[in-house]
Every structure is written in structure tokens, then in C-alpha cells.
Amino acid sequence: MFKTILYPTDFSDNAGQSLDYLKQLSTAGAEKIVLLNVIHQRIIDSLETIHKAAYFQDARYHEDREEAELRLTQERRNKLEPIVAELKAAGFEVIVRIEKGYPVKEILKVEKEEAVSAIVIGSQGRNNIRGARIGSVSEKVTRRAASTVLLVKR
């Protein structure tokens, strides 16, 4: 039914709950998980701003900014490692993707590139608003995705 599943995570508690549901899909024929983390464009822009300010004091601006982005990407990769191990232990083939940009846009881009049959996503992410039933990223992905979306309630 769902051979390839996209699992975008922002490392929130709700994303962790989604992982539990995701592992159960192996019994429904799921074989491959595309594990995605998006480094939000706001974070990249913040690095840019910080390093532009530092540029006037230090000529190594470009190296420092690139180094900061690499370090951030490696930190995300390290946070994904236990999730990869857990999914592999559950019998899945795992592809790891770390993208930079706006979460909704990147999730939909990866959905298309990896030809996924379903997306498993938490209803609320890191920036959850008290009382809201669904987060803005989850809501937009649910509306715009071409594949089935399993929205996991927190």
C-alpha cells in the first residue's frame, strides 16, 4: 500500500510520537523511509546576518558562514542518527535528507523527488500554538501534498 514514506521531523515531541506510528506501517507493506529535516530559511538568514556584521571586523566572513552552516548540518545529522537506527531496527531501508529552506516547500519538493506514497507528520511542530489543533506546516502539507498524509495528533 505505502511502499515509500516521507517522515519530516523537526525533533519536536509530536514528531517523536509520529515515529511510533511510522514504525507500525511496516506491517502494512512500507519498505523505505525518507527521513527529512529542514533547516529553516530563517536560521540560514540569521547566520547570514550574524556573519555580515562580523565581516567588518574579520575578513574570514565567507569561510565562517559556510563553516557555521556545515556545523549546523552536522548537528542535525547527529540528531537523526538514533532515528535512523530505530527505523533500520524496525526493518526499513532509510534515506536521510537534510534540506535548507522553507519547511512546506522542502517537504513537497522531497515528496516529488523521492516519489513517496505517503507522508507521516505530526499535527504540531516546535512552534506549536496553545489551543491550536494543527500547525501551519502540517496544515499546508496536508492541503498541498499529492500523496496520502497521515497526520499524527499530539
Name the predicted role of every residue range.
Residues V34, I95-E99, L150:
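General small-molecule cofactor/ligand-binding pocket signal
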Residues A118-R143:
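Glycine-rich, Arg-bearing micro-motifs that act as flexible, cationic patches
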Residues S147-R154:
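Short, flexible loop segments at boundaries between secondary-structure elements
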Residues F56-E75:
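A short acidic, glycine-rich active-site loop
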Residues M1-H62:
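Small/aliphatic-rich secondary-structure junction motif
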Residues D45-E48, L108-K109, A132:
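Short, well-ordered secondary-structure micro-motifs
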Residues Q74, N78, P82-I119:
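Structural beta-alpha unit
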Residues N37, S123-Q124, R154:
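Short secondary-structure boundary segments
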